[in-house]
Every structure is written in structure tokens, then in C-alpha cells.
């Protein structure tokens, strides 16, 4: 009898392992389709001729510029003439971003470099240089910790998922080992001995948007290595971001979001968190790895009862964008796009109780924007398809948002009237900073938390070129 039980348990274990292996492969293909904008018959069945040509034209231009900068046949010290310092996290990350774009062009049919043998060779040489001279086990973090522990390993995951068939296994192995070295645990930052020389040398619990990023690093490695335990480890580390906090970073019961301990940040850093969560929900949906932790429901509530007020005229109110308001390459409309994109992805994985309301928020944000039709400017075709589906679905009605919402924990208030007038008030207290400046950004934001009042008409372009001119 014992032998029969052991045999049955073994069979169940094998079947479970085989099923998980198929699910991991499915998640990888889904991610690959998302990254490449090439239909794999998952979320993208086909793409229009216009979108295809637009994607090819963009990749042709980018790949030409990138190849002109590459110096892999002239030196083994760096990859690009513009990023020669292989001890700089910034130069390594920029090099990887360019290689990532080159891989996209190489793998996209009808581009000028599609399946070009020399380009494939240059990609591998470039990654080998980085694996030996830049992102290496035993190296020290010089400069911004984020580049070494989040930016680089996240980009590496995407590169290795997209380029699994063209990147040499020895190079992949070295880069993954370096990723584990610099960011070993999804729950912590500053854990590597390399962090001692960075801008944030101390071990600390990874919170908010940073926790989503560190979890995605672990999740991506689990997908690449087909390691179910690593995938579960990443997913289990995500649940904490949905737990309401009473002080410091995170979401609050009144749907506020704080980052950097005392800055109202539902916008920029909230977007990072939502983006990471959206990827998890989208990629793990309909698998045994799906996120089912009850605390994630809190984030759905924050979206429906919080972001519905902060998304005004298709933009995100600037009182919750911290220092990013001073950047001359963005606006409230631009900063809202990744939030709306994330909500669209989240809606596809949310249960029916929340899905319809989130779709209604997305539809309202798109239709309220009379400056541009926002889906047309979305480069990711998976997301663009979802956005267009939501807009065209007559059963989805834009959410009717009216009344006053007080975000007491981040000292913000928003009021939306029946006549289309909206206003928001930005305050500060002993809990909340009056403004944030860092990295030479927002150095004149002195009074933006002193009761500053934002008054909106229905014109979405009112504040498009406002901040950076001050």
C-alpha cells in the first residue's frame, strides 16, 4: 500500500512539474510578445499595416544610429563610443538599452537588420564586454545604487528573454550571476557587498515602487532559468505593497501614496509600482502563479477611489508628482500615460468585480484628454490594443467622478464639480514635505506645498508647457 501511495505521489509531482514548466514557458512567450511588438497569438493576433510600418521605421532609424556608435571590433574596453566608462552604472545601463533596441530590430521581420549575422555577432560581443568589464561579480557599485540593483538587472532580464535564441549561453550565465550578486533578494536593497560604495550603501527593506522592481528582477530570472521557486519567491514578495501603512512609504487607507518617507507620490513613484504590479498581474494571469493575495485588493480600491480623482483631463495632477514636475520633457499628460497603460493591463487580470470599474476609469481618462488621442502615442502594441478595445466597447461607460476627495495622509484634496470645473489643493504638514528637490531637479519648488491650488477647465493642454518655464 505504501508503495502505491509513493508511486501516486510521484506521478502527481511529475504532472505538477510538467504543468508548471508549460506555464513558465507560456509566461515567457507572453512577455516576449509584449516586449517585441511581434504577434505570438497570445495578446497580439495581428497588427495593422500602419502599426507594422511605424514600428519598422522606428527600429530602422534606431538600429542605424546604434550601429554607428558601436565599437566592438575596435576595442574590448567598452561597447559604445558614447558610453566608455564600464565602471559607471549609467554607462552600462545605457549600453544595455541600446543593445536591447538592436535585438528588437534583429528579431523584427522586414527591418534592415532582420536576422543579420554580423549584427547578431555584434550583440554577443557587446554583451560579453559588459559581462567581463562592467556588470561583473565582485565589482563595486559606483554612483546611483538604482542603476546597479534595479535598472541594469531589469533590462538584462528583458534582453535575455527576447534574445534567448541568439545570445550565447555562457554570456547569459555570466550576466545572470552578476544580477544575483548585485540584487540577490527581492525584499531588500543594499544587500550586496557591492553596495558599500554606492549612493545608498546600507541594507534596507525595499518598499513601494522599488519593491515592485526588485520583485520583477527576481521574477524575470525565475522565468529565464525556469525556476518555479524563484518565481514564487518574487510573487510572495509583492503582496506587502498592497498592505496599508500608517507611516512612511506605501498606500494608506484614504488612498494616499507616499514615497521617500514624506512625499506625496501617487504620480511618478505610484506609476512605477502600478507598472510593476500590472506586469505581474498580466503575465501570471490564468496560471497557478497568479497573484491571489488579499492585500492586492487594497490596490484595486486605491485605483477606483483614489486615482479616479487624481486623473484629471487625461493627466495626473502635478501635486502628486514630486520633483518630476520640473522635467522639460514631460507634462501632466505625459506622466499620466504610463499610469493609464498600467491600469489597462491590470484590468485584464483583475476579477470581474474590479475589472469593469478600472476599465471605466481608463476610458474616462482617454476621452477626457482633448489634446490628443492617447492610444495613438503608445508604442507598445499589446497595451495599445487593450486601450482601443476599451474605448470602442460600448458596454464600458466612462466613470462618473464628482464630489470632493480628501487625501489626508498626503495633505492633498481634489474637488470635481458638475459643471466641469475641477480643483486640487497641495498642502504640507509635519508628516508631508512642502516640496522635493533631488538630483538638481525642482530646485525652485519652494511654495508648491503651501496651499497651492490647481484650477482646471476642460482644456487638457492648460499645463502642458507650464512647469519647466518657471
Model-derived features: positions:
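Low-complexity, Ser/Thr/Pro/Gly-enriched N-terminal "stalk/linker" regions
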Residues: 20-93
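Extended polysaccharide-engagement surfaces of secreted carbohydrate-active enzymes
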Residues: 280-295, 299-470
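Aromatic-lined, polymer-binding surfaces characteristic
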Residues: 67-336
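Sec-dependent N-terminal signal peptides
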Residues: 6-10
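Non-membrane alpha-helical secondary structure
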Residues: 20-23, 27, 51, 55-58, ...
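Bacterial Sec-dependent signal peptides at the C-terminal "C-region" and cleavage site
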Residues: 12-22
Amino acid at each position: 500500500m505504501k508503495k502505491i501511495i509513493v508511486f501516486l505521489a510521484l506521478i502527481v509531482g511529475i504532472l505538477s512539474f510538467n504543468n508548471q514548466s508549460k506555464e513558465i514557458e507560456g509566461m515567457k512567450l507572453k512577455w516576449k510578445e509584449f516586449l517585441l511588438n511581434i504577434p505570438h497569438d497570445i495578446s497580439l493576433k495581428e497588427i495593422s499595416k500602419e502599426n507594422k510600418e511605424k514600428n519598422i521605421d522606428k527600429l530602422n532609424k534606431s538600429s542605424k544610429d546604434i550601429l554607428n556608435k558601436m565599437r566592438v571590433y575596435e576595442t574590448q574596453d567598452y561597447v559604445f563610443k558614447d558610453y566608455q566608462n564600464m565602471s559607471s552604472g549609467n554607462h552600462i545601463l545605457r549600453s544595455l538599452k541600446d543593445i536591447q533596441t538592436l535585438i528588437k530590430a534583429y528579431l523584427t521581420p522586414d527591418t534592415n537588420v532582420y536576422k543579420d549575422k554580423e549584427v547578431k555577432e555584434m550583440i554577443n560581443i557587446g554583451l560579453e564586454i559588459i559581462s567581463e568589464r562592467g556588470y561583473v561579480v565582485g565589482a563595486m557599485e559606483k554612483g546611483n545604487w538604482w542603476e546597479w540593483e534595479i535598472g541594469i538587472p531589469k533590462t538584462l532580464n528583458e534582453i535575455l528573454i527576447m534574445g534567448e535564441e541568439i545570445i550565447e549561453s555562457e554570456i547569459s550565465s555570466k550576466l545572470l550571476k552578476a544580477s544575483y550578486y548585485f540584487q540577490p533578494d527581492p525584499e531588500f536593497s543594499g544587500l550586496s557587498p557591492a553596495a558599500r560604495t554606492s549612493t545608498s550603501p546600507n541594507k534596507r527593506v525595499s518598499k513601494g515602487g522599488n519593491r515592485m522592481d526588485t520583485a520583477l528582477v527576481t521574477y524575470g530570472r525565475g522565468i529565464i532559468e525556469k525556476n518555479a521557486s524563484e518565481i514564487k519567491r518574487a510573487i510572495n514578495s509583492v503582496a506587502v505593497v498592497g498592505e496599508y501603512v500608517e507611516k512612511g512609504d506605501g498606500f494608506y487607507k484614504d488612498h494616499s501614496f507616499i514615497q521617500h518617507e514624506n512625499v506625496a507620490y501617487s504620480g511618478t513613484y505610484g506609476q512605477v509600482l502600478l507598472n510593476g504590479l500590472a506586469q505581474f498581474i498580466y503575465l501570471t494571469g490564468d496560471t497557478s502563479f497568479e497573484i491571489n493575495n488579499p492585500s492586492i485588493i487594497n490596490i484595486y480600491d486605491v485605483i477606483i477611489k483614489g486615482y479616479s480623482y487624481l486623473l484629471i483631463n487625461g493627466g495626473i495632477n502635478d501635486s502628486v508628482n514630486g520633483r518630476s514636475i520640473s522635467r522639460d520633457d514631460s507634462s501632466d499628460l505625459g506622466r499620466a500615460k504610463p499610469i493609464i497603460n498600467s491600469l489597462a493591463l491590470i484590468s485584464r487580470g483583475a476579477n470581474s468585480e474590479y475589472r469593469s470599474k478600472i476599465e471605466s476609469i481608463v476610458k474616462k481618462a482617454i476621452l477626457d484628454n482633448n489634446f490628443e488621442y492617447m492610444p495613438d502615442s503608445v508604442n507598445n502594441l499589446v497595451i495599445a490594443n487593450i486601450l482601443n478595445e476599451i474605448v470602442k466597447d460600448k458596454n464600458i461607460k466612462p466613470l462618473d467622478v464628482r464630489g470632493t476627495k480628501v487625501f489626508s495622509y498626503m495633505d492633498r484634496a481634489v474637488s470635481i464639480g458638475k459643471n466641469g470645473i475641477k480643483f486640487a489643493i497641495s498642502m504640507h504638514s509635519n508628516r508631508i514635505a512642502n516640496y522635493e528637490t533631488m538630483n538638481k531637479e525642482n530646485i525652485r519648488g519652494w511654495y508648491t506645498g503651501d496651499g497651492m491650488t490647481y484650477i482646471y477647465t476642460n482644456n487638457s493642454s492648460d499645463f502642458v508647457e507650464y512647469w519647466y518655464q518657471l
